[in-house]
UniProtKB/Swiss-Prot annotation:
The keyword Nucleotidyltransferase applies. One of its GO terms (cellular component) is DNA-directed RNA polymerase complex. This is DNA-directed RNA polymerase subunit Rpo5. SUPFAM superfamilies: RPB5-like RNA polymerase subunit (SSF55287). It is found in: Cytoplasm. The keyword Transferase applies. InterPro entries: Arch_Rpo5/euc_Rpb5, RNA_pol_subH/Rpb5_C, RNA_pol_subH/Rpb5_CS, RPB5-like_sf. Keywords: Cytoplasm, DNA-directed RNA polymerase, Nucleotidyltransferase, Transcription, Transferase. GO terms for biological process: transcription by RNA polymerase II; transcription elongation by RNA polymerase I; tRNA transcription by RNA polymerase III. Part of the RNA polymerase complex. DNA-dependent RNA polymerase (RNAP) catalyzes the transcription of DNA into RNA using the four ribonucleoside triphosphates as substrates. It holds the Pfam family RNA_pol_Rpb5_C.
Length: 83
């Protein structure tokens, strides 16, 4: 069995929410609003398929925007760690 060299882009799947790496300024603003340090956010490994797709590096903060029929739009944040 041969492994395929094709890369699959998980961001095009209908069930995968929008992911984006925040700039340093945006990350600082979010952390200040939440009153927490980056390590207190839920973690996302740098090896996560979406982290690799958006080129997130350890130390980055990723903004994830989910669409929900109940709340409309839900924004969550993840702190990227190595692994």
């Amino acid at each position: 069995m041969r492994s395929s060299s094709k890369k699959i882009d998980p961001s095009v799947h209908v069930l995968v929410p929008k992911h984006e790496v925040l700039s340093v300024e945006e990350a600082f603003k979010v952390l200040k609003e939440l009153g927490i340090g980056p390590e207190q956010l839920p973690w996302m490994r740098a090896s996560d398929p979406m982290a690799r797709t958006i080129n997130a590096k350890p130390g980055d903060i990723v903004k994830i925007t989910r669409k929900s029929p109940i709340v409309g739009e839900l924004v969550v944040y993840r702190y990227v760690v190595s692994g």
